Amino acid sequence: MAMGAVLSSRTFASPLSSSGKQHPPQNNKCTCSSPPTRDKFSRLTTRTTIFQVSNYSRSTSMERFQLSARFHQPVVDSSTNYLTRWFYNANLKRRRIECFLTSDPINTGWLKPRRWDNFTSLDTACVQPDYKIPVRTRADCKAEQYEITGSPLSPSDVPAEAVLIGDTNEISPWWQQFPKRWTVVLLCFFSFLLCNMDRVNMSIAILPMSSEFGWSPATVGLIQSSFFWGYLLTQILGGIWADRFGGKVVLGFGVVWWSIATVLTPLAAKIGLPFLLVMRAFMGIGEGVAMPAMNNILSKWVPVSERSRSLALVYSGMYLGSVTGLAFSPLLISRFGWPSVFYAFGSLGSVWFALWQRKAHSSPSEDPELSKAEKRYILGGSTLKEPVTSIPWKLILSKPPVWALIVSHFCHNWGTFILLTWMPTYYNQVLKFNLTESGLLCVLPWLTMAIFANIGGWIADTLVGRGVSITNVRKIMQSIGFLGPALFLTLLSKVRTPAMAVLCMACSQGSDAFSQSGLYSNHQDIGPRYAGVLLGLSNTAGVLAGVFGTAATGYILQKGSWDSVFQVAVVLYIVGTVVWNVFSTGEKVLE
């Protein structure tokens, strides 16, 4: 930029002059620029374009060279008809220059240059320049990494025609430069935030609803479980639909479906219990497609070097959705009544869907606004394959890594669902906390999981970036996700103070969140084309573990103690660790 200021036909106050004296304008005379030559300096000066004085840009070309050169003012000698060069001595040492251009009207002017490609001969190169609106320009240059020595230019040294060095392209706003792949990731994050907000609001609203309609505890349990009827139904179907029709269509359908079911829940409850059960099952149908569809779309948009942290961010949306739902539901119910929580949370889905339709695409090849550079980075030299038309079930179920996913997901969710479902009861019966304290402490594991899921994601991607194999990274992260909870649940039966018990529970859930960079990321590793189906298969096993584990815990507590509950979970965590480390892989096994 500093070189551009020196070569410009405008008059400048030299940045090297302590007085900041303004040079008077040059008289109009027949001058021209020398034709382009093949030396380095000419290549810099002949490929640039004119821009307005108010623009600011920085020339980074100078940062790549240590130059020792002479600046020249070419003129035409009419008697000999050849170009003569007057040189300005400058010694440049390696530093960076930041230039800030300002202008104000005054009685001086600048001359419009002529492009070299318009000149047909040296005779036509000598032209009378056009006089433009008078301006005076000052260049304030701050040298930071380049040391420049030399005497300031005199008025006669400034060429009447010059070519400005620098990139004149306007810089796009930051929101246009934000990577499109992370726009998709953030939209998936907010969809999962809404998913758990709409799911947990019933756990709070069920209390005033049961009082109003006179429901028994058995009826309350039936209502709570009806959600899983639809949720189990669409796990595998959601994966098939996503792999065949694209993640954008399926995830958008899911959010709209469960949002409508959420808004209609108060009406169904007032009509009758059967209608409420059907509406809760419908809501489960919508939420059941969310995870397979998300997994499908991110398998196409996120490169392997960013896979762990992107999935960790999306799944942390579920945890933060639970925190948000548990925090705001009591406030809405106390001020506006229990129906308000369903209306408020359900209506947010329409806002998300509008953004989703405008910004998201099922794959990079379908996005017309995606830059070529980002597309190359996402694909990593490979090409996107056509959508799946048929599912090779026999091939999928014959792969040991697929069964490692299914078994590990079952073992993982058994312990996770037990802790999240029975935690308030444990706080109340064992630690003797009241219900209010128990409710507040229930938020702590969700916050811990949200934080540590993202920490684990960054650690996993860092290891991949440093050359650790994907297989080893997945095994390391999932081993932490299994053995961490096993350790802290074992310690939980030994502690005697409530504070230590709460700390053990929080640490158990925090280490559990490392699974987002383990088995939850592995579906895209072993079969990116079938990522939706693979997640549907393993998550079906995970949901079944939650259903059976929750029921089995109640049976164990009737016959035994909490120590027995934790021991069963610890055993399954160890089994999952062994299966995962023996049979899992980070390599692609399904084409």
From Swiss-Prot:
Pfam families (UniProt xref): MFS_1
InterPro entries documented for this protein: MFS, MFS_dom, MFS_Na/Anion_cotransporter, MFS_trans_sf, SLC17A9-like
Transit peptide stretch: 1-76
Skewed-composition ranges (Polar residues): 8-36
Recorded GO CC terms: chloroplast inner membrane
Swiss-Prot/TrEMBL keywords: Chloroplast, Ion transport, Membrane, Plastid, Transit peptide, Transmembrane, Transmembrane helix, Transport
Function: Probable anion transporter.
Similarity field: Belongs to the major facilitator superfamily. Sodium/anion cotransporter (TC 2.A.1.14) family.
Name this protein carries in UniProt: Probable anion transporter 4, chloroplastic
Gene: PHT4;4
